[in-house]
Regions:
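Active-site-proximal helix/loop segments of hydrolytic enzymes
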Residues: 3-7, 39-219
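Short glycine-rich His-centered loop
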Residues: 11-34
């Protein structure tokens, strides 16, 4: 009998957070209104979860259905309770820009009387972003522009309160991935199709695998 081969992520714990709806927003949508960010986040999150589990990862998801409302604080608390090696927050952007960007907490913020994340989590999240983003972009094979690695402080919410709410309450490395810009015609054409959504999930898997491989000595 041939023993089963361990997956690339055996023993690795990931919290997948399909963004929206939360206490702040229902999320964005394509210009024609036919595709919502909430739907893209959910569909890609489901596909990513299946891929991660197929590679042996333990996966916790922050909500049970697409339309469930979960606060950003609760989402972070789910990742913390699972002692996740990575809290991966899936979002889509809007605006005149294009491409995929990864955000990490670059400074502490304050929300509901809590200051966070800790300096150690900020450092760990930055390191995760530096490994994750290049792997994701490489796996997309030019399908989307590399919009880079950015701090939470560059976002509207993070600029006001110091960091994104999910990052403030995170006690594990936290990344927010703006997978595409739904209001950009190129990005929209890519992510609206099942093939594009599958490609995105596969690329995110590659990012997690790269981070897990780089983290293996301490796993």
């Amino acid at each position: 009998m041939v023993p089963a081969q361990a997956g690339s992520l055996t023993g690795f714990v990931v919290c997948v957070d399909p963004g929206h709806t939360s206490e702040t927003s229902e999320g964005t949508a394509s210009r024609d209104g036919r595709l919502t960010e909430r739907h893209v986040n959910w569909v890609v999150g489901e596909r990513l979860t299946a891929l991660l589990r197929a590679e042996g990862a333990t996966v916790v998801v922050t909500k049970a259905s697409e339309n469930q409302i979960v606060t950003n604080r609760k989402r972070a608390e789910t990742a913390n309770a699972a002692h996740a090696a990575l809290f991966l927050r899936l979002h889509c952007d809007s605006g005149e820009q294009s491409g995929l960007a990864t955000y990490y907490p670059d400074r502490q913020g304050r929300r509901f009387g809590v200051t966070g994340p800790s300096p150690a989590i900020m450092v760990a999240s930055h390191r995760a972003a530096q490994i994750f983003q290049p792997a994701v972009i490489a796996a997309l094979h030019g399908a989307l522009k590399n919009a880079g690695i950015k701090g939470d402080s560059k976002t509207g919410v993070g600029g006001k309160q110091g960091a994104l709410t999910g990052s403030i309450f995170a006690q594990v490395p936290a990344l927010t991935v703006e997978m595409c810009v739904l209001t950009n015609s190129h990005d929209y054409k890519f992510i609206r199709t099942p093939a594009g959504q599958d490609a995105m999930a596969q690329a995110l898997l590659a990012g997690v695998e790269a981070y897990a491989a780089a983290s293996s000595p301490v796993r």
